[in-house]
Swiss-Prot record:
NCBIfam families in the record: PRK04290.1-3 (NF003294)
Stretch forming the signal peptide: none
Source organism per UniProt: Haloarcula marismortui (strain ATCC 43049 / DSM 3752 / JCM 8966 / VKM B-1809) (Halobacterium marismortui)
Biological process, per Gene Ontology: translation
Name of the molecule in the record: Small ribosomal subunit protein eS6
Name of the gene this protein is made from: rps6e
GO molecular function: structural constituent of ribosome
Disordered: region residues: 53-88
InterPro entries, alphabetized: Ribosomal_eS6, Ribosomal_eS6_arc, Ribosomal_eS6_CS
UniProt KW keywords: Ribonucleoprotein, Ribosomal protein
Pfam families, A to Z: Ribosomal_S6e (PF01092)
Amino acid sequence: MAEFTVAVSDPEDGHTYQIDVDGQDANRFIGRELGDEVDGGAVGLDGYSLELTGGSDTSGRPMRPDVRGVTTKEIMSDGGVGFEPTTDGERKRITVRGREVSDDTRQINAKITARGSDDVADLLGDDDE
């Protein structure tokens, strides 16, 4: 059974909320790709719409939007998700996960694209430390 941590970022106030989802709510994410819109009800944000922006698998490999499917793939990267070059022209072979959410995915990053009537902090709880 799928189990994810969904990191929902609110672009208006800059806060990020981490929500653990499993069961039927987690199944709403299976098969979706980065860039897809998802109903916020899966994470407790009724009336909201979320866009999937990234994620990582059980080994910490990042999901890349330019790699198809759910499998891992070795790519030669000159920068972007999974590798930050330190000198001009530097390239590196890295292993990344495809753009589709699967059972191997452990974290999903999402941002709010459409707002509901209630405030995000009221729905998810404001965890001030």
